């Protein structure tokens, strides 16, 4: 917080000022991997204000009515995005992710079995929800390729 206070006081934000509309009219769905924070924009030649960046574990669309689709809808229908890119990377932590192992990690960090059981009772299928993917290229095709086409692509 001290850094942020100094940043604001010194007006460090001024060089980042832009509006909410992406200059390149692109939305990018990518992984939240820390290695991509600076690497992905550098590799694509994008800067602050160019694109709408949506990040999650694995860069996947895990539910047709989830937050990724909602974010893409806002980007497209409210903010002028005309192109969506789904970008994966090598050595992704979500690849080969085990739902059973993650549940064990949750328990080790204090989540009680009764909490997990209650969530399952509410309809959450932990096994499929927490499962990663086996193949990066197939994941991009499934979660970002022909699986989700706009009506303009199918006419």
Model-derived features: positions:
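Short Gly/aromatic-enriched secondary-structure transition segments
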Residues: 41-46
